[in-house]
Regions:
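Binding-site signature for planar aromatic cofactors or substrates
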Residues: 1-124
Length: 124
C-alpha cells in the first residue's frame, strides 16, 4: 500500500509515482513484469475502485526523464529518502463499485517511518 505519494497521470495510458525507501523494494524486483495498481475512494459519498493493469519500469530518481515532475510534488509527510520512479504503461483497467471498501476518516500519516528499517538491520 502506498499513501501520501501523488500518482501522476502522464498520458491516457501511463502513470508514474515517486517511490521512497522503506522496509522492502518488491516493486523493483518485478519491473518489466505485470503490475496492478489499485486506486480507491474511502469517502462516504463516493465509493469506487479502479484497477490499472500494466507493465512498470523502475528508474533511479536521478536518471529518470520524469525527475523534474516527480520532484515538483514530493510527499511532505514521508521522512525517507526518495529512491526511484515507478513508471507504469497501462494495458487495461477494471472498475468496481467500491461499496466493500470501508468509509475512512483520515487522521494523519504514520510518523514511525524507520520501523521497517530497524528489522532489516537486525536481520542483516
Amino acid at each position: 500500500p502506498k499513501g501520501g505519494t501523488p500518482l501522476h497521470v502522464i498520458d491516457a495510458n501511463r502513470v508514474a509515482y515517486l517511490d521512497y525507501t522503506g522496509s522492502g523494494n518488491e516493486t523493483a524486483r518485478h519491473a518489466g513484469g505485470p503490475m496492478t495498481l489499485m486506486v480507491m475512494s474511502m469517502s462516504r459519498s463516493d465509493a469506487a475502485v479502479v484497477r490499472l493493469y500494466g507493465t512498470a519500469t523502475v528508474t533511479p530518481v536521478e536518471d529518470s526523464p520524469l525527475r523534474e515532475l516527480m520532484l515538483s510534488e514530493p510527499a511532505p509527510d514521508i521522512a525517507l529518502p526518495q529512491l526511484q520512479v515507478i513508471d507504469v504503461r497501462i494495458d487495461g483497467t477494471q472498475t468496481s463499485c467500491g461499496y466493500g471498501v470501508p468509509v475512512y476518516d483520515f487522521v494523519a500519516q504514520r510518523t514511525v517511518s524507520e520501523r521497517g528499517r530497524c528489522y532489516k538491520e537486525v536481520l542483516a
